[in-house]
Amino acid sequence: MESLTLQPIVHIEGTINLPGSKSVSNRALLLAALAKGKTRLTNLLDSDDIRHMLNALTALGVQYQLSNNNTVCDIEGLAGSFHPQQPLELFLGNAGTAMRPLAAALSLGEHDIVLTGEPRMKERPIGHLVDALRQGGAKIDYLEQTDYPPLRVCGGFSGGSVDVDGTVSSQFLTALLMMAPLAQQDTTITIKGELVSKPYIDITLALINTFGGEIENQNYQRFMIKGGQQYQSPGKYLVEGDASSASYFLAAAAIKGGIVRVTGIGKNSLQGDIHFASVLEKMGATIRWGDDYIECERGKLKGIDMDMNTIPDAAMTIATTALFAEGETTIRNIYNWRVKETDRLSAMATELRKVGAMVDEGRDYLTVIPPKQLTTAEIKTYNDHRIAMCFSLVALSNTPITILDPGCTAKTFPDYFEKLASISHAKV
């Protein structure tokens, strides 16, 4: 297996232009494909998850042109739902942001499509979404294990009243919201339980609005959607920078800055993960907000105890930042870490212990007590891009750290380690 050893970094300073947001990129691609007219998407993320969506759209008859660096995409919209002429099998890797929305979008019309992916994708639950789609008339079969991909989707969704469990993943609701305006009849979606990762629903609603869709949001408990709508291309759409990816550079500044500025996101961004910066501020870092940047400067960091349900991806970065804080840090209400690219709660606890931390792993929380001195270790990354990036921060101590399978960052941030090196000053 490939590995990358990061030598101790003594100082961090500089500016990072962020790659496009994964969450925004895949939503925008799907909506542009379903819309009437041609859409130019700029600052599109160039990564594995986006390629899986693009490959699926090609198979489904969508025509598009990508720029040489894969960050500008001109898409000819279909002016409605997908109508593939023959049975298809779509391989979606481990891209939840492709699997869930496509399962919903393909529930419209009549066809025979199999959605499958990597072994880990077959362990990521999708039953709550399938249950909701079936309530609206969709014909969907599980091909292996009940409640998990691969799926056979044969269309049939027409609308009506559906309820969806909100406690596991906001992507199920996102998938329903993007598809429902194109259904023949009106749809009412009722949320069961507490809706997790609510800021991701705000991203979805903002994008639907940009493409001319109308949804009535009744306090995130019920959503009323008129059927028979048509998405309209906005012409051009700029994908903002990935706020989850910003977290590593902002945390690095909080630990060993110097001032680091990340550009492509700012105080008015769609993404909830910008509030990671506010968590760093609570820990003791200095944060400055601009319209299209966030700056962080080192401070004396103290441990915190916080509910981080609204920033689940960026909250992982707090777990490794906690290694450099005074006192213990507890990250609460993060059960949905367990259904991501890997069981992130278990994986983070295991790897944090390797570098010397004392860790209490609960069902839905993680407590980290930093050691006096971090120990060098080989970090297993579980084919999870965020674990690889989180543990790169250990190099901000006086201890080298080895990251196994560093290429797994290709899921969202292929050149992450090069970007980190560009603002790092190592021991000579």
Swiss-Prot record:
This is 3-phosphoshikimate 1-carboxyvinyltransferase. It is found in: Cytoplasm. It comes from Proteus mirabilis (strain HI4320). One of its GO terms (cellular component) is cytoplasm. Its main location: cytoplasm. Coiled coil: none annotated. NCBIfam families: aroA. Pathway: Metabolic intermediate biosynthesis; chorismate biosynthesis; chorismate from D-erythrose 4-phosphate and phosphoenolpyruvate: step 6/7. GO terms for molecular function: 3-phosphoshikimate 1-carboxyvinyltransferase activity. InterPro entries: Enolpyruvate_Tfrase_dom, Enolpyruvate_Tfrase_sf, EPSP_synthase, EPSP_synthase_CS, RNA3'P_cycl/enolpyr_Trfase_a/b. 3-phosphoshikimate binds at K22, S23, R27, S169, S170, Q171, S197, D313, N336, K340. Belongs to the EPSP synthase family. The lineage of its organism: Bacteria, Pseudomonadati, Pseudomonadota, Gammaproteobacteria, Enterobacterales.
